[in-house]
Amino acid sequence: MAEQISMIGTVILMMVVDFKKMAVEFRKFFELDSTQNFPALNIAEKKLCQADAQFEFNIIADADWYYKDSIQAYYKHRSNCHEIGIKESVYQKARNGDHSALYSIAHEISHWGLINYFKLSTGIPESEQIDPITKVVFIKIHENIADLLTSLLVFSEEELLQAKGAGDLDLSSFMSKDQLSLAHFYCQNHKTLKENFMKKLVSHITAQKNNSELQRRIS
């Protein structure tokens, strides 16, 4: 159930948030244009430290890594510390140009950007008393939009559509099938989603105004 609810929440955000525009703006923040590769490791090691006095980039020895093996990096947001941590072996892979390792770092940079740059946080503070299912839903939504922003930072819309469509472009070394499916859904439907949302919003506002006018006349 949490998975279904979080996907509905993600689609609603797709209706009201222009993630393509966000990706362009975030690239400009790092002085990158649309033709340049996204230098995830350089940004994490240098640029974020310059941009955010509370940012830390930490390399964790494999022996001290307390997350499951499938997690290559993490982002932690605290009041006095904004941290990206990465497993040492994954860091070495990133230095050698490994696609999956670099994409994982880019994903954590997206988390930093959503919370600190765009102020778009769907996370739950640890001190907040909330039921477990709701907490999982919020976490999943935040992961989904971080996945989406990352895909748009690293690839063009055309590349994402080609990878899912004709299969001419293989992005499996960068992202999972679920991440690619989410990016493809957005690229294929974001205009329609936004148009439908605006139509429904205008229709709802008009109906409310008409109802208010009717109530005024009756009274």
Give the residues covered by each predicted segment.
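Active-site hotspot residues in diverse enzymes, especially metal/ion-binding acidic/histidine motifs
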Residues: M1-S219
